[in-house]
């Protein structure tokens, strides 16, 4: 026989032996499992008590623990046994008394260890006839309003202390009195006559009339400032058929040093702080010309106007160069154009003209 045939036969025998061994070991494990289960069942049956009819009845009578509510144990005295010969007492039914509403005056509050105060008797009022004359009295009312007649003295020649001493303090001096007006008019005429007759009145006045100079100077300075103030303006406009979005525009302005300030405009300060003076400002071209920080995500505009007030804090020419540089940078970042005040393209020639205006 060949060696290959011998090897094949040996392999087949080995497989048959393995299969037979596996079946035998499987059957053996099953038999052990059933034996263990039987022994475990017998042990449980031996541990359980044998139930009797009496125990079954007791189990039925006893309710589960969760169904019986726990009640508090109350110790009660045993009822008193009454003799049989005693007659039952008649049962009296109390009719409910209807509670009538009581007034506040009928409610009484008593305190312990305090004697009740004697009830105060209601006051008795007696109607006595009036001693006055019951007949009606008639008074003649003047047609004109009545005023206290002033003292027949010339009030114009009296001092303030004399007038206050003679006048009622509650009413004061009656300035509508014709008598007082007549006296004041006469006194003024006499004063004018004395002034015209006095030789001092003919002399020229040596002292000039003094006016409130600070107030007048302030008004003149304000007028001069209004006349001298001028503005330099540039426009940063979006491309045709395009607009600047609010958040993008504000971010570009803040990158250039602008900050939201007075009148809801963006201002460029001298030291980049709010406390420093404003060099130039940026306003919205679209009405009302301001920036609402709460609606920037919905905000679109055609452009902004950058303007500087002259004279400005510091060097006007240097500030104008900073403004021109800021406008060019803003237009480059947003993809727009810089325009002059006449809304023309801001070229190098226009820049030289702007700088030439500033001395």
Swiss-Prot record:
Residues 78-101 are annotated as: Disordered. Residues 26-359 are cytoplasmic. It is a single-pass type I membrane protein. Keywords: Cell cycle, Cell division, Cell inner membrane, Cell membrane, Membrane, Transmembrane, Transmembrane helix. It comes from the Bacteria. Pfam families: ZipA_C (PF04354). SUPFAM superfamilies: Cell-division protein ZipA, C-terminal domain (SSF64383). Its main location: membrane. One of its GO terms (biological process) is FtsZ-dependent cytokinesis. Residues 1-4 are periplasmic. GO terms for cellular component: cell division site; plasma membrane. The chain crosses the membrane at residues 5-25. Coiled coil: none annotated. It is found in: Cell inner membrane. HAMAP family: ZipA. NCBIfam families: septum_zipA. Belongs to the ZipA family. Interacts with FtsZ via their C-terminal domains. PANTHER family: CELL DIVISION PROTEIN ZIPA (PTHR38685:SF1). Essential cell division protein that stabilizes the FtsZ protofilaments by cross-linking them and that serves as a cytoplasmic membrane anchor for the Z ring. Also required for the recruitment to the septal ring of downstream cell division proteins. This is Cell division protein ZipA. The gene is zipA.
